[in-house]
A protein has these predicted regions:
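Conserved acidic
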Residues: 2-579
Length: 579
């Protein structure tokens, strides 16, 4: 790096500076090594564990550091015994610019064509000030969020969790834990108890699908005119107002068609494994996985399903043919107070121009997913922990030794044979029912639009995209209240209608103005795209330490990867356009 800037939260002693400026990673590490060993030192960087960390450590150093991670994300690296590197993006789930006014990024930082790109000697005081402002924004965001979190959980010295989902869950537990899930012991201590059959949770786990995203039939890659996109305000928080399965009151039910219809009539939560048959004129919307991708247009269903979608299916053209497994539960309002309190708080903050409303938004949107946290296999990469494990006589019964690469030259790491990391917050029937309710809400609005003659081209979790509306108004409940719908406009635009749009596939579409200029490009997984999937596009990323270790390459290096759509890329068409 050209330089690194660090700002302490505050000056803890008279010799501490307000900011530290380092010209290389070695200088910063030398400073870190002199920090008092009797304290914990936590360093935050935004998206830091995928980018900034490589300014300090090489591939092997990162491999050898103890870490907290899931298969795709490192939440924390530990350096020595008392220094921790955490990624603020896991708490502040938006670009840093969302939390404060940033300046314009100097071109020499990001543009390889700039004559000063990579030239350390070209760094000016203005460049340093740009980065200083970044660090100020991050420091203020983290300290403000921590103060709010301490207030919400009622603990003066509470430290921030690693992720926004964990933060939301702890706030919910501290303020809204159901009293019926707690009891007092003979010693006067309050104990919290949740117990359920794992078999019931596993069934719901198989019914846990994400948001529905699709281009509607015969419209993929077709240019449509006068497009409009409507988003539902706070889709998941709005659905969390409903009743959900009570984990302490889960029972196995007689797996029969008659029992399902009785549970449906009673309006209680239930789930199971079902076989359904589509009838003519019925709605096609049930989730399935086909070729490892979500598919919503099947005319038969055989799998796990939660009660919101099954109830809707039975009311809209589907017949229940067989019940293979059935669970029921008593309903409980788990989140109503939580959602209403924080939604009202956010509205009040927005009304007063209080920027802290962004943190409340994070809290509202992050909670439900925590109940769907997956079990994970423990992965140990650092030599010290591996050595301790392998000194045990029976370590091979618990762990599998895996090579970093096929030639075994890059070393080994350990993976537990069983999923040993089991989140205590996990209860899949809740998470699966919330997402099921959201998909039903989406489908009911799509069906209403289609019934009234509107053309639906695309949907994504909480949004519906229409085209060629004419003067008709779609049947959404328009407004700014929780659960109402609102019109999405391109950034910086006041127009209601997008003159032309092309939807290629999930998470990939382009909006254009009347002059053919692109006003919005959505292309997931591709950072540098012009929105035309018939051409090769470029994704710019940073090589992570795992990839570097496997391939024997340098970590932290910018990588340009050519991305070609399997469905849309056409070499001949590209040649024609060039000629």
């Amino acid at each position: 790096p050209a330089f690194i800037m660090v700002m302490p939260e505050k000056r803890y002693h008279k010799n501490m500076k307000e900011e530290y400026y380092f010209k290389d990673g070695a200088s910063m590490l030398a400073w870190i090594d002199k920090l008092p060993k009797s304290y914990r030192h936590v360093f935050y960087a935004h998206n830091g564990n995928k980018f900034d960390i490589y300014a300090l450590f090489d591939t092997q150093a990162l491999v050898d550091m103890p870490k907290l991670a899931n298969p795709s994300t490192v939440f924390q690296f530990r350096y020595g015994e008392n220094v921790f590197f955490k990624d603020s993006l896991q708490l502040l789930s938006a670009p840093l610019a969302s939390y404060g006014a940033k300046g314009i990024t100097p071109k020499k930082f990001i543009d390889p064509n700039d004559p000063d790109y990579g030239n350390k000697d070209s760094i000016t005081e203005q460049d340093i000030e740009y980065c200083r402002q970044d660090v100020v924004i991050l420091r203020d965001a983290i300290t403000t969020l921590r103060s709010l979190y301490q207030e919400w959980v009622g603990m003066e010295n509470a430290g921030l969790p690693l992720t926004c989902a964990s933060m939301a869950y702890r706030v919910w537990c501290s303020r809204y834990w159901p009293s019926e899930w707690s009891f007092e012991t003979k010693n006067g201590k309050i104990k919290h108890l949740v117990a359920f059959k794992e078999e019931a949770a596993n069934c719901a786990k198989d019914a846990f699908f994400g948001g529905r995203v699709m281009v509607f039939p015969n419209l993929a890659g077709v240019e449509v005119n006068n497009a409009m996109s409507y988003d539902r305000n706070s889709m998941y928080p709005a659905e969390m107002l409903k009743t959900y399965p009570n984990p302490n009151k889960v029972f196995k039910a007689d797996a029969s068609i008659g029992r399902v219809h009785r549970l449906k009539k009673q309006g209680v939560p239930y789930w199971g494994r079902f076989v359904l048959k589509w009838k003519e004129e019925g709605e096609l919307f049930l989730p399935a996985i086909v070729d490892k991708k979500a598919f919503y247009l099947g005319k038969a269903f055989d799998g796990a399903l939660m009660y919101p979608e099954l109830n809707y299916a039975l009311n809209h053209g589907w017949e229940l043919v067989e019940v293979k497994e059935l669970w029921r539960s008593e309903g409980i309002e788990l989140f109503k107070e939580y959602v209403e309190y924080f939604y009202d708080l956010r509205l009040e903050m927005k009304k007063n121009g209080d920027q802290r409303e962004k943190f409340v938004k994070i809290l509202l949107n992050s909670l439900f997913g925590k109940f769907g946290s997956k079990d994970r296999h423990e992965r140990i990469e650092d030599k010290e922990t591996m050595k301790k494990i392998m000194q045990k006589d029976n370590w091979r019964q618990e762990y599998e030794l895996k090579a970093w690469s096929n030639d075994h030259e890059n070393g080994f790491y350990l993976v537990s044979k069983e999923a040993t990391i089991k989140p205590r917050c996990q209860f899949f029937p809740i998470a699966a029912a919330i997402t099921s309710n959201a998909r039903v809400e989406l489908q009911s609005n799509i069906a209403r639009c289609q019934a009234e003659g509107f053309n639906v081209v695309y949907c994504d979790t909480d949004s519906v995209h229409l085209y060629d509306l004419g003067n008709k108004k779609p049947p959404f409940k328009i407004g700014s209240a929780l659960g109402q719908w609102d019109l999405e406009r391109p950034k910086g635009s006041t127009a209601d209608v997008v003159p032309s749009a092309i939807y290629y596939e999930r998470k990939a579409y382009t909006w254009k103005d009347r002059n053919g200029r692109r006003i919005k490009i959505k292309h997931k997984g591709v950072s540098k795209s012009d929105g035309d999937l018939t051409k090769a596009q470029t994704n710019i990323s940073v090589r992570k330490y795992k990839t570097a270790k496997r391939r024997g390459l340098e970590a932290g290096v910018e990588v340009h990867t050519v991305k070609k759509s399997k469905k849309w890329f056409n070499e001949n068409e590209v040649s024609k356009k060039k000629s």
